[in-house]
Regions:
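Walker A (P-loop) ATP-phosphate-binding motif of ABC ATPase nucleotide-binding domains
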Residues: 218
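Hydrophobic anchor at the beta1->P-loop junction of P-loop NTPases
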Residues: 221-222
């Protein structure tokens, strides 16, 4: 259901990027399933989880983390991300990870991060990462966000929002504030459950500020 007026070339590029991302998600999921013994049965996994020895406690911690990652990858196979940012940090900016100062990068945001092993390249950035502030609070043009090593300033040239369902790209739109309001309205109208299942895709600037507020400082919310 291609309802936006973006060029066909953009649709083709985004569909290919989605297909490549889903292939990475499937590959990472398969590695975890094989590592956990899920493909060949759960006997070894259950035996370790039931063992009460000290060594087993360490293994249990590792296994539970892997199970959590596996659960996230399974959900990501239906919707790996919901937005894209094109951002160029200023030269000398204290950026981390896959961003490079002075170079424009496309950043895809999802409910969870997706790393491609063994290179550990960031394919999808977690919505809680510092750079995701640009999606919730930034407008096209000069922007900044707080990173662990200091403030990162630069140029935001694109904010694109996606509707992806069961691994299929259904809609996308490039947006500033007005477009984001429309996306919020459309997303909420499609919620058939009383529970907002995809709330991270519809957070607005003021809500984002509250979510990221220092947990050890007082905060008063009115209304």
């Amino acid at each position: 259901m291609e309802t936006t007026t973006l060029p066909a070339r953009e649709w083709a590029n985004e569909k290919q990027h989605l297909a490549d991302t889903l292939q990475i998600v499937r590959s990472e999921r398969q590695k975890l399933e094989n590592d956990l013994g899920i493909v060949d049965g759960n006997d070894r996994l259950i035996q370790v989880l039931d063992d009460g020895s000290t060594d087993a406690e360490v293994q249990q911690f590792v296994i539970r983390n892997k199970l959590r990652s596996l659960h996230q990858l399974r959900l990501s196979s239906r919707q790996p991300y919901f937005a894209r940012l094109d951002f160029m940090p200023d030269p000398g900016a204290p950026v981390l990870g896959h961003l490079k100062a002075g170079e424009k990068s496309s950043i895809y945001l999802g409910r969870w991060g997706v790393l491609e092993t063994p290179s550990y390249q960031v394919r999808v950035a977690d919505w809680r990462s510092p750079v995701a502030n640009l999606y919730y609070s930034g407008q096209i043009g000069r922007v900044s966000y707080e990173a662990p090593d200091g403030r990162v300033e630069g140029e935001l040239s694109l904010k694109r929002m996606f509707t992806i369902s069961d691994g299929q790209l259904e809609d996308m739109q490039d947006t500033g504030l007005a477009g984001q309001e429309k996306y919020l309205t459309d997303a909420l109208s499609q919620m058939t459950s009383a529970r907002l299942r995809e709330v991270v895709t519809t957070i607005q600037a003021e809500q984002n500020t509250v979510i990221r507020f220092d947990a050890f400082s007082p905060l008063c919310v009115q209304g």
